[in-house]
Amino acid sequence: MSHQHILDRLAALRAADAPTHGGRVLSYVYDSGLGEIDELAAAAMRLVQPVNGLDPTTFTSVAVMESEVVAFARDLLGGDSDVVGSVTTGGTESCLLAVKTARDNWRGLSRASGATPRLLAPVTVHAAFQKAAHYFGLELDLVPVLPSGAVSAGALIERMGPDVALVVVSAPSYPHAALDPIAQVAAAAAAQGIDCHVDACIGGWVLPFWSDVEPWDLSVPGVTSLSADLHKFGYAPKGASVLLQRGRDRQRSQYFATTQWPGYPVVNATMLGSKSAGPLAAAWAIVHALGRDGFASLAASCERSTTALVDLVTSIEGLRVVGAPVGPLLAVAMDDSVPADRRIDPHHWADEVRARGFLLQLQPGLAQADGTTLPPTTHLTITPVTEGVLDELGAVLVAAAEAVRGVPPVNAADVLAALPAGMLESIGELDSETALAILQGIGLVSAGAGLPDRMAPFLALIAALPAPLTERLLTELLARAVEPQA
């Protein structure tokens, strides 16, 4: 196969993707709108394409770039000379390493001999921390939040105890853009000798320039670590994130090292051994090109667009913005205070917006442990490029709202009634073929098919079925998507 044919096929495959530039996808994509920054990042990645990030003593450029990126992040995020850090492959790895570090340090203190360490966080904390608890054997203690998405500091503080290895707060939370009460929680954690991590993966490179934000970063007493994604509002290619840790001795627990094999001595600061230096080089180049002033200018654009969109959504009868979002993201829910024929279901709204050329992110509701329920919402992430399409986007949001006004949400009972007879009673532990049969039965898997164009019924199904079942079915759906075709 010729090189040109290969590239042509890749271009054809890419044409089926959601657009990564232009502001038409309001999740997953962090577009600065600066073509020269994209070109700089690509050139930097090309220069280090053969470099193995495993060993910064052999490839010394890796050590220099990582040191300079960490230094910039430390200065931006309120750290002092006692703060050290690493560049990871993404927010999930940063979160995993923060939990692993805290767990190992907790074990070293032996405050609860024989106990299972506990990870304490609001229920809105990123799912990466659920993964971390699962991987590293911590009990996950998720605290319910208010209908606004905000968590009470007291609700977290009263659950602290000697078995808590780490408390996590968000700056802001992804689902609702709520800024957790970081100063109060960190102070209480410090008083009990508990590590406190700030997950600023989505906000870390933007909130330093945002208006009227409560203290949230490493300048807050009691904060022991912080994560901030370079591949979000640091505008770097996937995947690059920074994990900052307070105290060299604390941070060394993040590392893995062994000389107990007949090969080369292994020392890994992060989860991976061999890894591409490309995302690091791109992030390093962008940090130097933009500097604080460049990031501030891009954040200002995000803030203007966010303010405009919050005002617009608030003006649409039947919709409401959830809580008081902090940063360039927001969640939109149905306004139950208006008559039923004036209400707008956020999932039908998102589907209608998609049909008109913009992609929003549907979020299911959640039944919390205290019996309260968080409503279904639609999520929007705002980037600098949003400002250039703001008029078109606003017109689409309004027109889509009118198109679905009064259409009731998908009824969970109707969703369950459409399932094959007796399915829920006979499932037990699903094997792969049974899971596939269920997916086919509900129309989610067919030859060449992706997810449905209308996602509201799909989200209603997720909400209606037991969580372990939906998790198993979604696992099968994603696994089948990347299996070799027969």
Regions picked out by a protein language model, each given a short descriptive name:
Residues 89-257, 263-269:
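Conserved PLP-enzyme active-site core in the AAT-like
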Residues 73-98:
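Short loop-beta-helix segment that forms the pyridoxal 5′-phosphate
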Residues 81-82, 323-329, 373-375:
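Short Gly/Ser/Thr- and Asp/Glu-enriched loop/turn motifs at secondary-structure junctions
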Residues 212, 216-328, 332-342:
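Active-site C-terminal subdomain of aminotransferase-like
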Residues 87, 320-325, 362-364, 370-371:
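Short beta-strand
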Residues 58-62, 85-92, 121, 323:
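Active-site nucleophile and cofactor-binding loops and adjacent substrate-binding regions
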Residues 1-63, 67-71, 333-486:
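Non-catalytic terminal extensions of PLP-dependent enzymes
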Residues 184-187, 191, 308, 348, ...:
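Alpha-helical scaffolding segments of alpha/beta enzyme cores, especially the outer helices
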